[in-house]
A protein has these predicted regions:
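Generic secondary-structure signature for well-ordered alpha-helical cores
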Residues: 6, 10-13, 70-73, 157
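Glycine-rich phosphate/ribose-binding loops and adjacent secondary-structure elements
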Residues: 14-135, 139
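Generic detector of bulky aromatic hydrophobic side chains
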Residues: 4-7, 18, 31, 61, ...
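Generic structural signal for well-ordered alpha-helices
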Residues: 1-9, 36, 65-66
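C-terminal extensions of enzymes
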Residues: 138-174
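Generic structural signal for well-ordered, non-membrane alpha-helical segments
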Residues: 1, 32, 61, 145, ...
Length: 174
């Protein structure tokens, strides 16, 4: 990881793209600290916390991320790789994480699950068949501003691939 980071940093000296150093170390604080310091020495645009979502418990993950974010500068983007459930996302945002990569909003959209403040609901449920309101009242996403819940349900049932884009947009916005 350190060799890759040095090589990548050298290649991207004059690039307009952002480059992130990846902090590794598993569950071991001393390895994470060493990795973070190596990445900080290279002065990246942001820092990714890698090696998560591979078997640690949620509390272990929070401890690892909290420890690592305390080392990383708060004025640079901090990105967690591979974590995607809503509870973890909210917990990690509270710890100072700015970015994530996950498929969860899209995956659940394909199954008709719609995120709202209470969690999510299943759009396939027949009770949404005639609902003329947006998916979430007050939501300012493109889908909610332009389409009713009943129309989104119609697309999901009759033209599912057409619905996924709109439902994913909504889920990401939430």
């Amino acid at each position: 990881t350190n060799t890759w980071a040095r090589n990548a940093r050298n290649v991207h000296q004059n690039s307009t793209q952002s480059l992130f150093g990846i902090v590794q170390g598993g569950k071991y604080k001393e390895l994470r600290e060493m990795s973070a310091k190596n990445m900080l020495d290279l002065d990246f645009n942001g820092y990714a916390i890698g090696g998560l979502a591979i078997g640690e418990t949620p509390s272990e993950r929070k401890e690892i991320v909290s420890f690592t974010t305390d080392i990383l500068p708060s004025d640079k983007l901090r990105y967690v790789m591979g974590v995607g459930d809503i509870k973890s996302l909210l917990d990690l945002i509270e710890l100072g994480i700015d970015m994530f990569d996950c498929v969860w909003p899209s995956r659940i959209a394909r199954h008709g699950k719609i995120i709202n403040r209470a969690g999510f609901f299943n759009l396939k449920n027949n009770k949404y068949k005639d609902l003329k309101e947006p998916l979430v009242i007050g939501c300012k996403c493109y889908t909610c501003l332009n389409y009713s819940t009943s129309y989104m349900r119609h697309l999901l049932i009759n033209e599912p691939t057409s619905s996924w884009q709109f439902l994913t947009l909504h889920n990401i916005f939430q």
